A protein has these predicted regions:
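Conserved nucleotide-sugar donor-binding subdomain of glycosyltransferases
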Residues: 1-38, 86-91
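Acidic anion/phosphate-binding donor-loop and adjacent secondary structure
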Residues: 77, 128-144
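An aromatic- and histidine-rich active-site surface loop
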Residues: 12-24, 39-59, 65-73
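Membrane-proximal helix-turn-helix segments that form the acceptor-binding/catalytic region
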Residues: 47-50, 54-57, 71-72, 84-104
Length: 251
């Protein structure tokens, strides 16, 4: 839509670009009075790297740029309908960060291979989980056959085939239909909701919305099945989502 077009062509690399100037000013005052060993920037939002770059240039301090996701090749960028000038500007910013930082950190070997085409040094540190919220030994699983997805679910990850199969199973078995419970905890795209409705699974579905991290962990621990999805896009083999590690924690 129009707002996506504005976002993609005028807010480069992202809407947080307006943080850069005031953040550099604020952090430079801190650096003038404190000694630090290293600056670590993490994105997205990739505007954070622009802040770190300016501080790195002004101070003799090492800089690690952490790429949790790709930059110019991020899967939802195509939704912004970027014009050539915007694409080129975004790419130039990315290449500048990759060349100027002392080291690039990223989450998977596949993404490392892509970044190494430009960056001089790339290291992999995978996602993990916070052990502070470990599963309790006395977790009671749902009595229903619960399938839960926790987190942001964009249209690119819409599990159409899964919904089709579940619809078929509900048709075949009234027992299965009564026992099935789909939980979506977090922000779910409208396209996914439409697909659920089209497959007559709406009565089996609970859209919980946003909850605290602790509540999300509780849903995760009591669910019979945890649903892990990655975007159905080009180069998705490099996507090693942090959700995988959160799910692995649920015993």
């Amino acid at each position: 839509g129009f707002l996506s077009f504005i976002r993609g062509n005028f807010f480069i690399p992202d809407p947080k670009v307006f943080w850069v100037k005031p953040s550099v000013s604020y952090l430079q005052k801190y650096l003038d009075n404190h000694t630090i060993d290293v600056i670590i920037s993490t994105g997205p939002p990739h505007s954070m790297h622009l802040i770190a770059e300016k501080l790195h240039q002004k101070n003799t301090v090492k800089w690690l740029a952490d790429f949790r996701d790709p930059w110019s090749d991020l899967y939802y960028n195509k939704d912004f309908n970027q014009l050539a000038f915007a694409k080129n500007k975004n790419k130039r910013l990315e290449e500048r960060i990759l060349r100027n930082s002392d080291c690039i950190l990223t989450v998977s070997n596949s993404l490392k291979e892509e970044l190494e085409k430009t960056a001089k040094k790339v290291e992999v540190i995978t996602n993990g989980f916070d052990d502070e919220f470990s599963a309790s030994n006395n977790v009671i699983l749902d009595t229903k056959f619960s399938i839960s997805y926790i987190g942001l679910l964009p249209k690119q990850s819409n599990p159409k085939l899964l919904f089709k199969v579940l619809k078929g199973l509900c048709k075949e078995s009234e027992i299965f239909k009564k026992d099935l419970k789909l939980n979506f905890i977090g922000d779910i795209s409208e396209e996914v909701k439409v697909e659920i409705l089209a497959n007559k699974l709406d009565k089996n579905t609970d859209f919980v919305g946003y909850v605290s991290h602790q509540e999300a962990i509780a849903y995760q621990n009591k669910s019979q099945v945890l649903l892990l999805l990655i975007p159905n896009v080009k180069n998705n083999k490099g996507i090693l989502t942090g959700k995988l590690f959160e799910y692995l924690k649920a015993k």
